[in-house]
Amino acid sequence: VHWSAEEKQLITGLWGKVNVADCGAEALARLLIVYPWTERFFSSFGNLSSPTAIIGNPMVRAHGKKVLTSFGEAVKNLDNIKNTFAQLSELHCDKLHVDPENFRLLGDILIIVLAAHFSKDFTPDCQAAWQKLVRVVAHALARKYH
């Protein structure tokens, strides 16, 4: 994947403003609320019976932070995303059996969360760079499935 200097700047510039805990929790909660079938991967998280329960669930919050922290590794390693996510791809494929389509869904949700939090900074060019990034990350995570 080739990243232009502008794309790298748009991605890293916005990432520097992201509160990983808050945006991660919001992104994972939105995924579970908007796509309720994804809850089956989080059965150990306790009460996911309503949007209020999901948003208030400390395990959702903690895992959302973990997911977005991991996503930060992609931002730090834009030129080596495939290798950065090799172990996570293996884990999600072999042990967790997560449908790789869910990576794309979470990427789309992350775009919505970023746009909501950073509306002034989230220009069409910024969105294009982030769409490319979430596609590349989703592809890297789905790699072990092929």
From Swiss-Prot:
Pfam family, one: Globin
Keywords, in A-Z order: Heme, Iron, Metal-binding, Oxygen transport, Transport
UniProt GO molecular function: haptoglobin binding; heme binding; metal ion binding; organic acid binding; oxygen binding; oxygen carrier activity; peroxidase activity
Domain Globin, residue spans: 2-146
Subunit structure, as described in the record: Heterotetramer of two alpha chains and two beta chains.
Similarity comment text for this entry: Belongs to the globin family.
Name used for this protein in its record: Hemoglobin subunit beta
